[in-house]
Regions:
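Oxidoreductase cofactor-interface core, primarily capturing Rossmann-like NAD(P)-dependent enzymes
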Residues: 2-105
């Protein structure tokens, strides 16, 4: 929910963001803010697409940083299988240290 949908506008702050998700998403956003100020230990924060759902492993996902990834149909999605692959890839070969990254199609 802390990914940007426009410059300076996070998904969390849009009218479309579901009210029932705000408590959990708000806590996650606060954690990211705390981590972004942390220099004493190595951390990585992973933000999924707007929708993370069961699906096949395709291996055809994109990585991003602070912007919500949108596919050519205007959707922000990732399967749990591909999300897991991206996280494991990061664990095996870290490339996002002291930053957040996101995964989507």
């Amino acid at each position: 929910a802390s990914l940007e949908v426009a410059p300076g506008v996070q998904l969390f702050d849009t009218p479309e963001f579901p009210e029932q998700w705000k408590a959990t998403a708000g806590a996650a956003r606060e954690l990211l803010q705390i981590l972004q100020g942390e220099k004493h230990f190595n951390w990585t924060y992973v933000s999924p697409s707007a929708f993370i759902e069961p699906g096949e492993r395709t291996g055809k996902f994109r990585l991003g940083t602070d912007q919500l990834l949108i596919n050519d149909r205007g959707e922000s999605r990732i399967s749990t299988q591909d999300f897991a692959v991206a996280v494991l890839d990061e664990l095996e070969s870290p490339t996002h240290q002291h930053v957040r990254f996101t995964v989507g199609y």
